[in-house]
Amino acid sequence: MSSRPSRHFKSETQSKPKMGISNLFSFLVPKNGLFFDLFAEDTANLLEQANEFNKLFGTQDKSEQLAIIRRVKELENKGDEITHRIFLELSANFITPFDREDIHELATCIDDIADYIQGTASRIELYHVDEFSKTMELLSEVLVKQVSEIDTAVKDMRNMRNADRVREAIVRINSLENHADDLFDEAIARLFADEAPALELIKMKEVLSNLETATDKCEDVANVLESILVKNS
């Protein structure tokens, strides 16, 4: 009886390469500073958008104003893309530098600010606002200061040894928001006291309201940053 040649089968463990500890770790942990880099890019873009919007109050040239409004929209679109990238990385990475919910909330709140800046610029164009009130200019300046504080605070979050600096920025953001509330309330009171024409009153109130809401959204970012500090202190 002839013997059959023995067959050699590769075991499943031989056919599939093993995932080493280092490979597993790189899968679980995002690239060094990935989320911090994305947030730094996001807030830098937001600051550029806020500064661009603020240029509206420095010119009376309609073509320049329209160019500024277009640029504000472009920067808002860029912010949307960065937010989407943050959400994609959040889905793809198992371990994150702080709570996933906080990362999602921080990205959403930053995006909200950009949306309201762009929304204010669009209303100025759509409503054919020809003259800007002093309060609009002052609110825009407050917004730029808030976003500048956000940009610095978010970059400081990379190292928790900067926690005190972040807390100081949070206090300043909230204080600026309170100032914006006062400016808005006084402006609306003046509109009614001056008995402005109904159409003009509606246009001014819409623009002022959107601009003031943008400052409120800055406070939302400050609240998220404070939550992150509390959880990681």
Residue positions per predicted region:
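Cytosolic, long alpha-helical scaffolding segments
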Residues: S2-S233
